[in-house]
């Protein structure tokens, strides 16, 4: 087969959106695959069509116990040695998942998993614990908290694109709204002077030149940026040695509007100049580049 994508993660985190995106990219998508049949299914497609793009969705509907998850992880490692296979793991904050389930009125797959009905929040937390082993071996972990559907599609398209995948994911965020759960490292942009307290800059963002000029005028800005670029590249090199193909860096400030956005912007420019492929996501602004 040309390529296999395994889509997994938490219920309500966006697997349906990713499945539709993969179909649009020419993948045959098989949903809710029984894990015991995964080997046979992929072997069938491999024998039938060497050029077929295949995506399978596997989640807690078919992984109900820790033993099943552990066996599935072992199966994935075996399959990776035999065919080109990547695992995409989707997650979101508990509050986000609660909101999505309450909006759609769908029943969480673990609500009845123990034979008796449990609260939705308990089902979500149980699933996070259950799927943690699978999360740890995934090729990419996408946190869809606050992410619009088109932004998720964009990130998936970039990950599975024909060119090499991104080496850095840079996320600007507000500390008031929580840290991005998939970040490998956090940079704190609150050390710089805050444009929020300048009336003519308050409603602007770190994408505006006037805000950039103000923040860059901080005597610490250039030194911190140079150090952060060096740290990012050194950390990425160590991640590569551990078999991890990319590094996720979160950059936070108070509101996620000014300083963190600019730092992500400048980090991206410098890392790109240094030959790296970078994806940026300004979480509080709802934009991906």
From Swiss-Prot:
Signal peptide: none annotated. InterPro entries: P-loop_NTPase (IPR027417), RapZ-like (IPR005337), RapZ-like_N (IPR053930), RapZ_C (IPR053931). GTP binds at residues 59-62. Pfam families: PapZ_C, RapZ-like_N. ATP binds at residues 9-16. Belongs to the RapZ-like family. SUPFAM superfamilies: P-loop containing nucleoside triphosphate hydrolases (SSF52540). It comes from the Bacteria. Keywords: ATP-binding, GTP-binding, Nucleotide-binding. This is Nucleotide-binding protein COPRO5265_0725. The keyword Metal-binding does not apply. Displays ATPase and GTPase activities. Transmembrane segments: none annotated. One of its GO terms (molecular function) is ATP binding.
């Amino acid at each position: 087969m040309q390529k296999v994508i395994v889509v997994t993660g938490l219920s309500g985190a966006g697997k349906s959106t990713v499945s539709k995106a993969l179909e649009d990219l020419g993948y045959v998508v098989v949903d809710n695959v029984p894990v015991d049949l995964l080997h046979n299914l992929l072997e069938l497609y491999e024998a039938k069509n060497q050029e077929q793009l295949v995506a399978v969705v596997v989640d807690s509907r078919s992984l109900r116990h820790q033993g099943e998850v552990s066996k599935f992880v072992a199966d994935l490692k075996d399959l990776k040695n035999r065919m080109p296979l990547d695992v995409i793991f989707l997650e979101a904050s508990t509050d986000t998942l609660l909101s999505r389930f309450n909006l759609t009125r769908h029943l969480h797959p673990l609500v009845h998993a123990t034979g008796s009905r449990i609260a939705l929040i308990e089902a979500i937390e149980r699933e996070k614990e259950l799927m943690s082993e699978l999360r740890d071996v995934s090729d990419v972990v996408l946190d869809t908290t606050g992410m619009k559907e088109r932004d998720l599609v964009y990130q998936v398209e970039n990950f599975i694109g024909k060119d090499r995948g991104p080496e850095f994911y840079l996320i600007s965020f507000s500390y008031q709204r929580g840290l991005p759960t998939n970040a490998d490292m956090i940079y704190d942009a609150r050390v710089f002077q805050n444009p929020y307290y300048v009336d003519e800059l308050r409603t602007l963002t770190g994408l505006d030149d006037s805000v950039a000029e103000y923040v860059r005028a901080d005597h610490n800005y250039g030194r911190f940026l140079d150090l952060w670029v060096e740290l990012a590249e050194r950390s990425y090199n160590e991640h590569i040695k551990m078999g991890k193909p990319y590094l996720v860096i979160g950059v936070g400030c108070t509101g996620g509007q000014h300083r963190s956005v600019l730092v992500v912007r400048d980090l991206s420019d410098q890392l790109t100049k240094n030959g790296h492929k970078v994806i940026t996501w300004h979480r509080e602004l709802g934009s991906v580049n």
